[in-house]
Amino acid sequence: MGPVLRRRGGAPYWRWIQSIGSFISEQDPDQLSSAMGPGASHIAELIPGLREKLPDLTDSPALEPEPARFRLFDSVNTFLKNASQSQPLIIVLDDLHWDDHASLLLLEFLARGMAASNLLLAGTYCDVEVSRQHPLSQTLGSLMREQLFRRIQLGGLTQQEVSEFAELSAGVALPDNALDLVHRRTEGNPLFVNEIVRLLSQGEVATDPGWAATVPEGIRDAIGRRLNRLSSECNRVLTTAAVVGRQFNLDLLEELSSDFSEDQLLELLDEALKAGVLEEVRMGAERFQFQHALIQETLVSEISAARQVRLHARIGVALEELYGAEVETHAAELAHHFAEAEPVLGTEKLVRYSLAAGEQALAAYAWEEALFVFDRALAAKEGQPVDDDSAALLFGLGRSQAAMLDNQTRIEAYSNMKSAFDFYVDAGNVEQAVAIACSNTFPAWH
């Protein structure tokens, strides 16, 4: 299933939407209907494109938040288990440490339901990115207590493996002293080994007795040297792309790089592709991604906060133009960029897309993500007079909190929803006041 977007840059369940949506697009409608059964209408809440395959689906009846999420998860679990009966399925989840909370909850649910199925889940994550407070720690802890997964700790390459890697990947035969240094300096980390071998193969590291002093001390140093070999124009384009995210579309980059012609931009992308900095996501899809997340992070870290803010502003405006009438379906992505651009653009667009993204997250039972989105927008409006937007954000935040199982959070839900209710009453907006009073989260705070 490949890499996912950075957590706050994409919609909840993004990796599942991509992977299950891709699988669904390749299936016959009759097969889908059979594998999904009555759960098809529930899965359509997660994968809207399913209704194009199965146009006769009805809407799911409304439920309280927790039963509704269980119904969705159970429907996905049943579908994948049934689909794996005709042919075994392996789902590979890369970079789990970037997943949103809702995606990890779905992963945990599926892991519990895999018994007696032909479904295998395999995931990778960077352990140094996962603190005790990280959502993935909670997921792994729960699965470990129930003995539902096997952890395979990946150690570094041995000296012999480093030698073989250098020869196979770059045709470099490392002498013993060089091999020993490279192995010690990298601790066998394949990414770091790859970067140093690249430098060796390009003559970056001299063969004289002092060559060892030029070997990079860290992976970011090695990545920096690879970027230094690219033209300044290529680095400028890559920096813009890095602020977009790990993946980016060619049409967006064209909008953001108007000082280059199309041919010039393609030549610069070819330069980055040949250097192994970028790779095409799919041939012909005009979508690219950085070969490793650390390359993207290195580029972003090298520019000032002020420049990042202005790039996010340009990206948000360009995305609005590119998405056109479908802009609301990409609300989470736009909310992310306009949140980063708030110091120069203000809160208007941040609030607009946060309201849409929050409602979409609530509709997908991703309450944790909805809570984050609403809260972020409210924080940006702090100090401003309460208005319709603030009340709508408070209502959304309250519904997100009311869906949580934590009592303290539900108490906060009451306070936020009451604040929204009082504003609408004072403003004479009876319709919105009634909507709050009649919402299915009303019993949680009344």
Segments from the language model and where they lie:
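Conserved Walker-type P-loop NTP-binding/catalytic site
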Residues: 13-90, 140-148, 157-167, 204, ...
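Structural signature of alpha-solenoid helical repeat junctions
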Residues: 326-333, 346-349, 369, 387-396, ...
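Conserved P-loop NTPase "ATPase switch" module shared by AAA+ and STAND
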Residues: 80-103, 120
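A short hydrophobic beta-strand->loop->alpha-helix junction that borders the nucleotide-binding pocket
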Residues: 1-9, 125-126, 154-155
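Short secondary-structure boundary elements
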Residues: 18, 155-157, 161-372, 376-381
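Alpha-helical solenoid repeat scaffolds, predominantly canonical TPR units
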Residues: 353, 373, 380, 409, ...
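Tandem amphipathic alpha-helical repeat scaffolds
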Residues: 125, 298, 336, 356-363, ...
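Sensor-1/coupling segment of RecA-like P-loop NTPase cores
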Residues: 106-153
